[in-house]
Amino acid sequence: MARTILVADDNRGFTDLLRATLEEAGYEVVTASTGLAAVECMRRHDVGLAILDVLMPGISGDAVAERLLQVDPTLPVLLMTGSSGDFAVGSGLPVLRKPFPQEELVAAVRRLVPPA
């Protein structure tokens, strides 16, 4: 399985923090700041995990997840949300509630994409 992770979030500072955390944990990371850019990244890169913010400009993270899973139903997807609502939970996909400790992110990623 590819160890490249797609991180999609419209908050650039947060995306940079996640990239640094995941690279330190040994993963390659590509980023996108919109849902449409996330879909395009998936076309260009061999991604083994998609980490998607639920609320992004254009296409929402849960809609992106739905599109990606139509193409590859085995793709691990992890949603992130700062919302207190449970709308993302209904998707059946794992959800990290922002803010979350970096250790929680790495643990969730390792459950979905075990280290090589």
What are the roles of these predicted feature ranges?
Residues 9, 53:
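Active-site residues of response regulator receiver
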Residues 13-24:
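Charged docking surfaces used in two-component/phosphorelay signaling
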Residues 31-49:
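Acidic, metal-coordinating helix/loop segments flanking the phosphotransfer/catalytic sites
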Residues 33-37, 59-64:
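Acidic catalytic/metal-coordinating carboxylates
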Residues 40, 62-74:
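Short amphipathic alpha-helix used as the core "switch/output" element in two-component signaling
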Residues 56:
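Receiver (REC) domain active-site loop signature in two-component systems and cognate sites
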Residues 80-81:
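Hydrophobic/aromatic residues positioned on beta-strands within the core alpha/beta folds
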Residues 100-113:
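C-terminal output helix
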